C-alpha cells in the first residue's frame, strides 16, 4: 500500500527518524473504535455515545486540530489555509492521532476516536502491529448535512425553516 509508505516517510521527515519505533513501543492491546466520515454526519455525537456506553475514552481529531491552532496562536481558519503550504501541521496531527490509536494514553479499556480520517491512520497502525481496531464510516445526505449545519451554526429556527423549505432530492 503506497499510502502506508507515504505516511511512514512523512513521519520520519517531520517528526523524526525514530518516530515509527516510538509508535510501535506505545501500541497496546486496548480496542479502539475509529469513526470517520464527512463533516456534519454525526461522528462526534455517536463517538461520544459509544465512549459513554462502553465507559471508554473519547478523542476528537477536530479538537486536536483546534488545540494545535491555539498553541500556534492562530485561528482554525488560518491554520486550515496553512495546510495548503505547510505539510508539517497535517503530519503532526496525523502522528498524534496514531499515538491516540496506540491506546497508550488512555486509562480506560477502550478508546473511541472520531475525525475525518482516523481509519487511514488505523490502517497504518495496524501495519505497525496494532490490533483490535474497529472502523466505522459515517455518511448522510447533502440535505441532512445542510440541516445539521443550520441547527448547529444558526439555531433551531433556521433548522425548522430549512426542514420546511429544503427539498429532499437525491444528489448521488
Where in the sequence are the language-model features?
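Hydrophobic anchor at the beta1->P-loop junction of P-loop NTPases
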Residues: 35
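ATP-binding Walker
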Residues: 41
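ATP-dependent small-molecule kinase phosphotransfer cores
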Residues: 3, 61-127, 143, 155-156, ...
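A glycine- and Lys/Arg-enriched "phosphate-lid" helix/loop adjacent to the NTP-binding pocket
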Residues: 131-172
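Extreme N-terminal, non-catalytic leader segments
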Residues: 1-31
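P-loop (Walker A) phosphate-binding loop of NTP-binding proteins
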Residues: 38
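Walker A/P-loop
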Residues: 44
Amino acid at each position: 500500500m503506497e499510502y502506508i509508505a507515504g505516511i511512514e516517510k512523512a513521519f520520519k521527515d517531520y517528526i523524526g527518524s525514530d518516530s515509527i519505533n516510538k509508535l510501535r513501543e506505545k501500541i497496546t492491546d486496548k480496542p479502539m473504535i475509529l469513526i470517520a466520515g464527512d463533516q456534519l454526519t454525526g461522528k462526534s455525537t455517536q463517538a461520544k455515545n459509544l465512549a459513554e456506553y462502553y465507559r471508554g475514552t473519547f478523542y476528537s481529531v477536530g479538537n486536536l486540530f483546534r488545540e494545535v491552532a491555539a498553541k500556534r496562536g492562530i485561528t482554525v481558519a488560518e491554520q486550515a489555509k496553512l495546510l495548503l503550504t505547510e505539510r508539517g501541521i497535517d503530519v503532526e496531527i496525523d502522528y498524534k492521532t496514531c499515538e491516540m490509536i496506540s491506546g497508550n494514553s488512555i486509562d480506560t479499556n477502550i478508546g473511541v476516536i472520531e475525525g475525518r480520517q482516523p481509519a487511514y491512520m488505523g490502517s497504518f497502525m495496524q501495519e505497525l502491529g496494532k490490533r483490535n481496531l474497529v472502523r466505522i464510516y459515517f455518511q448522510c445526505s447533502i440535505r441532512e448535512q445542510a440541516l445539521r449545519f443550520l441547527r448547529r451554526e444558526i439555531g433551531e429556527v433556521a433548522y425548522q425553516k430549512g426542514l420546511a423549505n429544503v427539498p429532499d432530492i437525491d444528489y448521488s
